[in-house]
C-alpha cells in the first residue's frame, strides 16, 4: 500500500489501471513493480534528506559573497553554497530562466539547481547548443528509464544522449523482448512523467551507498567497480527512478515539451561473449511540440533521401550476404568514389603530402608494439597463414599475446606509417613528413551495427599522418584546419569543431599535454569557425579536434578528425637528427578530412538527394536524338564527350516522344541533356537543357564540351546555372 501511495503522490499511474470519471477499468496486464524499486527509492530518500541537511549546514558555515562572471564581461554577486545558476538566470531574464537547460561553471557542466561554491565564470546552455542538446536528451533517456522500470520491470543498463537523440538499453530477462506494439504505451507513460514535472535530484553517494542503491542491478555494480575511481559518484532521482549518472540534467521533466519513441532493437552488453541480450529503445525529444513536428517533416525527407534507396535506384552500389560488411560499387558508384579520391589527391599535391601504399596484412607483433592489440583487439580480424598449426591465442596461457604465426588485417594505417618513417635515418631538414594513404582498412564492428555505407567492416579513409618537430605543430594544425574548410566548402557542408582534452587515464607528461592543448586551442580561436570544449574527452595518447559536419538537412555527421599522438613515436622509437646533431622525437598528427570514403559518399548521397554536382555526377550528360535520322550524329556527340573524359549516355529510344525522353532524363537527374535534331547535326552543335528544365539553347559542340570540362575542374556545385 505504501508503494501505491508514493506512486500516486509522484504522479505515476497505478500499474494496470487507468483513471476514468465514473469507474476504474482494468487494462491489459502490466507487470507488478519490482520489489527493489520501492527499496531503492526509500534508500535514496534517506540519503537525499541527509544531503539536504549537510547542505543547509554548509550554507550556514561557509556562506560568503562570491563573484560570478557572466558572458560579455558582466559580473554579479552571489552567496556561496546558496545561490544557484537558475536563480541568477531568473535575475537576468525570465526567458533565459525558461530556456536554459544547464550551466557551465568554470568549464564544467553544472545543474541549474546546484548551488555555486566559489568565484566562477558562468555560462548558460540552451537546447540550441550541442552541449544543451546532450543534457536535454540525457534527461529524456532518464524519463524513458523511469517508464521502462515502471511498465516493464526493466533492469536499466545505459541511457546516453547521441548526436540525434537518445536511447536506453535495459534487460528484461533471457526470454523477454520489447515489442514495437509496446512503444505507444511506453511513450504514454513518458508523457505522464513529463506532465508531472518531476524534479531531477542530484545526489552524491559513496561507493558503499552506490552498491546498496544498485545491489539488484549487476550492470550498475560492474560500472561502479570499473568506472568509479573516486570516493563518491553522482546519482539522479526522477520520481521513483534512480540512476547512476554524471549529469547534469534538466531541472524537471516538464521542460520536455515533446517526446517520441522511434525504434526497438536488441543490443549487447560489453561484447558478443556477454550472456545477456539487452533491449534498446531509441527516441527523440524537444522543448516544444513544434520542433518535433519540424523534425518529423525532415525525417520524412531524410527517408526519401536514404543513401541505400538512392544507391539502388541509381545503380551505384549494393551489398551481398556472401561478403558481409563490405560494399560492391557498381560503375556509377565507382565514378563518384574515384572523383572524391581524386579531389583529395589534388589537395594532397597542393599541400605537400606524399601518397604511399602500405600492406594490408601484418604480424600481430606490430599491433602489440603499437598498443592496438591490447586496446583494440576485439575490433580486429586475425588469421593464420595457410599451412600453420599454431595454437589459437584464446587457448594460450597469455591472452594478451598472440603466436608468432598469427596475422591481422590493419584497422588503421598509423603503425605502418611509423615503420615507414623509421626505415631510414631522418633529419630535421626533412620535416614535416606528411604521409597519405588510401589503404583498405578492416574493423570488426558488431554485425548488428552494420548499416549501408555508414558502418562497414571493409572501407578506405583519406588517412594521413604528419611527423613534425614541436616547433612546427601550430603551423601544421592550421594547415589541417584549412584543409578541412577547403574540402567541406566544395562539398557544401557546414561544420562544427570540438576540442577534446586529456582524460583521467592519460599517458605522457602533463606539460606536453598542456602545451599541445594550448596550441590546439589557439589554432581553433584563430581559425574563426564555431567550436566547443569537451574536457576529458581526448584519447589517452593525445588531445584531438573532432569535426562534426552538417548536411543539407542539418544532420550532424562525425567524419574528419585531427588527433595528436605522444605515444606512437615513443613506442616505435621514432627519431630525427635535430639542428644540434642530437636525436629528437617527432610529434605525430593523425588527420582525416573525409574519414571513411564510403561513409562520406553515403552522407553526400543523402545531402544532395541523388542530384549530384557535375564534378561528382555519374549522370553528367545524356544525348537525345530527335529522330532516328540523327542517331549517328548523337553517337558522335557521345563519343566526343567520352573522349574528353566526361560521363555520357545515349537515349535513342525514338519510340518515345522527345518530351518523354527529356522528362525521363530529368527524373534520372542528368545534369544536362544535349538534344540533337537536323539543325544541330548540320551545324555540329547541341541544344542544351538542364535537369531543372532550363533551356539554354543551341551551343557549339566543341564549345559545350570545353565549358563542361571547365565547370567539372572547378568543382562548382551549380554547373547548371553557370553553363
Swiss-Prot record:
It catalyses: tRNA(Thr) + L-threonine + ATP = L-threonyl-tRNA(Thr) + AMP + diphosphate + H(+). GO terms for biological process: threonyl-tRNA aminoacylation. InterPro entries: aa-tRNA-synt_IIb, aa-tRNA-synth_II, aa-tRNA-synth_II/BPL/LPL, Anticodon-bd, Anticodon-bd_dom_sf, Beta-grasp_dom_sf, TGS, TGS-like. GO terms for molecular function: aminoacyl-tRNA deacylase activity; ATP binding; protein homodimerization activity; threonine-tRNA ligase activity. Catalyzes the attachment of threonine to tRNA(Thr) in a two-step reaction: threonine is first activated by ATP to form Thr-AMP and then transferred to the acceptor end of tRNA(Thr). Also edits incorrectly charged tRNA(Thr) via its editing domain. Its main location: mitochondrion. It comes from Rattus norvegicus. It is found in: Mitochondrion matrix. GO terms for cellular component: mitochondrial matrix; mitochondrion. The keyword Ligase applies. This is Threonine--tRNA ligase, mitochondrial.
Amino acid at each position: 500500500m505504501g508503494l501505491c501511495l508514493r506512486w500516486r503522490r509522484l504522479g505515476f499511474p497505478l500499474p494496470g489501471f487507468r483513471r476514468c470519471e465514473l469507474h476504474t477499468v482494468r487494462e491489459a496486464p502490466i507487470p507488478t513493480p519490482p520489489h527493489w524499486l520501492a527499496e531503492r527509492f526509500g534508500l535514496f530518500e534517506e540519503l537525499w534528506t541527509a544531503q539536504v541537511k549537510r547542505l543547509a549546514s554548509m550554507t550556514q558555515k561557509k556562506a560568503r559573497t562570491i563573484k560570478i562572471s557572466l558572458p560579455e564581461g558582466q559580473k554579479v554577486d552571489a552567496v556561496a553554497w546558496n545561490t544557484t545558476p537558475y536563480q541568477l538566470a531568473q535575475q537576468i531574464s525570465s526567458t533565459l530562466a525558461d530556456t536554459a537547460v544547464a550551466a557551465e561553471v568554470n568549464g564544467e557542466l553544472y545543474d541549474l539547481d546546484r548551488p555555486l561554491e566559489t568565484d566562477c565564470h558562468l555560462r548558460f546552455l540552451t537546447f540550441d547548443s550541442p552541449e544543451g542538446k546532450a543534457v536535454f536528451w540525457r534527461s529524456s533517456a532518464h524519463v524513458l528509464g523511469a517508464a521502462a522500470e515502471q511498465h516493464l520491470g526493466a533492469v536499466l543498463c545505459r541511457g546516453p544522449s547521441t548526436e540525434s537523440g537518445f536511447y536506453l538499453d535495459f534487460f528484461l530477462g533471457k526470454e523477454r523482448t520489447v515489442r514495437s506494439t509496446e512503444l505507444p504505451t511506453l511513450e504514454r507513460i513518458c508523457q505522464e512523467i513529463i506532465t508531472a514535472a518531476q524534479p531531477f535530484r542530484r545526489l552524491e553517494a559513496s561507493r558503499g551507498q552506490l552498491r546498496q542503491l544498485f545491489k539488484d542491478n549487476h550492470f550498475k555494480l560492474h560500472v561502479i567497480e570499473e568506472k568509479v575511481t573516486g570516493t563518491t559518484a553522482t546519482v539522479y532521482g526522477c520520481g521513483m527512478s534512480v540512476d547512476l549518472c554524471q549529469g547534469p540534467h534538466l531541472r524537471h521533466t516538464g521542460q520536455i515539451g515533446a517526446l517520441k519513441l522511434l525504434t526497438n532493437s536488441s543490443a549487447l552488453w560489453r561484447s558478443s561473449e556477454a550472456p545477456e541480450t539487452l533491449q534498446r529503445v531509441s527516441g527523440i525529444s524537444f522543448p516544444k511540440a513544434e520542433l518535433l513536428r519540424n523534425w518529423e517533416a525532415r525525417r520524412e525527407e531524410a527517408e526519401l533521401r536514404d543513401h541505400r534507396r538512392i544507391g539502388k535506384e541509381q545503380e551505384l552500389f549494393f551489398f551481398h550476404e556472401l561478403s558481409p560488411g563490405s560494399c560492391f560499387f557498381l560503375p556509377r558508384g565507382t565514378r563518384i568514389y574515384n572523383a572524391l579520391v581524386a579531389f583529395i589527391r589534388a589537395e594532397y599535391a597542393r599541400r605537400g603530402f606524399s601518397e604511399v601504399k602500405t600492406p594490408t596484412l601484418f604480424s600481430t607483433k606490430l599491433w602489440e608494439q603499437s598498443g592496438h592489440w591490447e586496446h583494440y583487439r576485439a575490433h580486429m580480424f586475425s588469421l593464420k597463414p595457410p599451412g600453420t598449426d599454431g595454437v589459437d591465442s584464446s587457448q594460450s596461457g597469455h591472452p594478451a599475446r598472440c603466436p608468432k604465426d598469427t596475422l591481422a588485417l590493419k584497422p588503421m594505417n598509423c603503425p605502418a606509417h611509423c615503420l615507414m618513417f623509421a626505415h631510414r635515418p631522418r633529419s630535421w631538414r626533412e620535416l614535416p613528413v606528411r604521409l597519405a594513404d588510401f589503404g583498405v582498412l578492416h574493423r570488426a564492428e558488431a554485425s548488428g551495427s552494420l548499416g549501408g555505407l555508414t558502418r562497414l567492416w571493409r572501407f578506405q579513409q583519406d588517412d594521413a599522418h604528419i611527423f613534425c618537430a614541436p616547433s612546427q605543430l601550430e603551423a601544421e594544425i592550421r594547415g589541417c584546419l584549412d584543409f578541412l574548410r577547403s574540402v567541406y566548402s566544395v562539398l557544401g557542408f557546414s561544420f562544427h569543431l570540438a576540442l577534446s582534452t586529456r582524460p583521467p587515464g592519460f599517458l605522457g607528461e602533463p606539460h606536453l599535454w598542456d602545451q599541445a592543448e594550448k596550441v590546439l586551442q589557439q589554432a581553433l580561436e584563430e581559425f574563426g569557425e564555431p567550436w566547443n570544449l569537451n574536457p576529458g574527452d581526448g584519447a589517452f595518447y593525445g588531445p584531438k579536434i573532432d569535426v562534426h559536419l552538417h548536411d543539407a538537412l542539418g544532420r550532424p555527421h562525425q567524419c574528419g578528425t585531427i588527433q595528436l599522438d605522444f605515444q606512437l613515436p615513443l613506442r616505435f622509437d621514432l627519431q630525427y637528427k635535430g639542428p644540434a646533431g642530437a636525436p629528437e622525437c617527432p610529434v605525430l598528427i593523425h588527420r582525416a578530412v573525409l574519414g571513411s570514403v564510403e561513409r562520406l559518399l553515403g552522407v553526400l548521397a543523402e545531402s544532395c538527394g541523388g542530384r549530384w554536382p557535375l564534378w561528382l555526377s555519374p549522370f553528367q550528360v545524356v544525348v537525345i536524338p530527335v529522330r532516328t535520322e540523327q542517331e549517328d550524329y548523337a553517337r558522335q556527340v557521345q563519343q566526343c564527350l567520352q573522349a574528353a573524359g566526361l560521363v555520357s549516355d545515349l537515349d535513342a529510344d525514338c519510340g518515345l516522344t522527345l518530351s518523354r525522353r527529356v522528362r525521363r532524363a530529368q527524373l534520372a537527374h542528368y545534369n544536362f541533356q544535349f538534344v540533337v535534331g537536323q539543325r544541330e547535326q548540320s551545324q555540329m552543335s547541341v541544344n542544351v537543357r538542364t535537369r531543372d528544365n532550363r533551356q539554354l539553347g543551341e551551343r557549339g559542340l566543341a564549345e559545350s564540351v570545353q565549358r563542361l570540362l571547365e565547370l567539372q575542374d572547378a568543382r562548382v556545385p551549380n554547373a547548371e546555372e553557370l553553363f
